[in-house]
């Protein structure tokens, strides 16, 4: 309900920043779920498909994306839980509200399995270089080939998506090249790379959601309108983070490694 309260004060839902925060939470969570469904499908293919080559390809994708799901998703869980607390103001910090318990419960998740930095290192030093970089390149090629359409309604989303996909390709090539001579650059940029891969992969999952949403739109307009509007927020407000992480990483590691700690 977006109407004002009876005493003349605005409900918090009428404030643009509250709405932004809620949509940030919603667009990330729903995109993560869609990507997890895709990853679960790849797991099934890797185990049960009759063709050996197809099984191996799916297994490679699961291996590539596992650090992303473990690391980025738990980092975002902390961001989202913190935002949920923030929306409630001081009351969100109290025990009887419940969000502070969720925050404390979630805080361990980025530390599980060797911490998220270890997941990022595993991605860039092992998964990215595996099979001479063929896995990431094959993944990018498959995504690009799948994300083509004559649907005019999806094309604006694809335009933004393809720009970020190109950024991910440049980032992957940069990391692969630096791994040969400048391992500090790779290590310093590992978290940034993982996040870029993650945000672009979530966008890929949203493209798949949009394809269904526009195809089946007449069957449930309210439901699919919600999906389309949520995807639009993700592409406008969240996906640009991918470019930011790329620019941060390619600045290198010299400042980091030369800094004198007391």
List each model region and its residues.
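Glycine-rich cofactor-pocket loops
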Residues: 1-25, 41-62, 147-159, 175-191, ...
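Acidic/histidine-rich catalytic neighborhood
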Residues: 4-53, 94-113, 117-118, 123-130
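Short amphipathic alpha-helical segments with heptad-repeat character
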Residues: 23-26, 67, 74, 162
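Aromatic- and histidine-enriched alpha-helix N-cap/loop-to-helix transition segments
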Residues: 27-34, 72-75, 194-201
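Amphipathic, well-packed alpha-helical segments that form the structural scaffold of globular domains
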Residues: 37-40, 44, 78-85, 144, ...
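Alpha-helix capping/hinge segments and adjacent helical runs
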Residues: 38, 60-138, 233-256, 261
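Short glycine/serine- and small hydrophobic-enriched flexible loop segments
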Residues: 41, 82, 125-126, 205-211
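C-terminal amphipathic alpha-helical interaction region
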Residues: 130, 146-262
């Amino acid at each position: 309900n977006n109407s004002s309260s009876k005493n003349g004060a605005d409900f918090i839902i009428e404030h643009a920043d509250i709405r932004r925060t809620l949509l940030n939470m919603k667009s990330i969570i729903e995109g993560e779920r869609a990507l997890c469904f895709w990853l679960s499908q790849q797991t099934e293919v890797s185990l049960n498909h009759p063709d050996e080559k197809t099984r191996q390809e799916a297994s490679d994708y699961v291996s590539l994306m596992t650090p992303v799901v473990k690391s980025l998703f738990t980092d975002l869980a902390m961001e989202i839980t913190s935002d949920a607390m923030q929306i409630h103001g001081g009351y969100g910090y109290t025990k009887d509200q419940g969000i502070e318990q969720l925050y404390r419960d979630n805080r361990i998740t980025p530390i599980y399995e060797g911490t998220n930095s270890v997941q990022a290192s595993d991605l860039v030093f092992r998964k990215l270089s595996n099979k001479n970089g063929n896995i990431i390149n094959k993944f990018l090629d498959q995504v690009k080939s799948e994300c083509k359409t004559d649907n005019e309604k999806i094309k604006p989303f694809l335009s933004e998506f393809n720009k970020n996909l190109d950024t991910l390709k440049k980032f992957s090539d940069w990391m692969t090249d630096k791994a040969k001579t400048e391992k500090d650059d790779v290590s310093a940029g590992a978290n940034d790379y993982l996040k870029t891969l993650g945000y672009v992969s979530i966008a890929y999952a949203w493209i798949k959601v949009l394809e269904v949403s526009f195809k089946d739109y007449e069957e449930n307009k309210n439901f699919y309108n919600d999906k389309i509007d949520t995807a639009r927020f993700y592409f406008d407000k969240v996906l640009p983070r991918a470019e930011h992480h790329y620019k941060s990483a390619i600045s290198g590691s010299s400042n980091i490694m030369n800094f004198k700690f007391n």
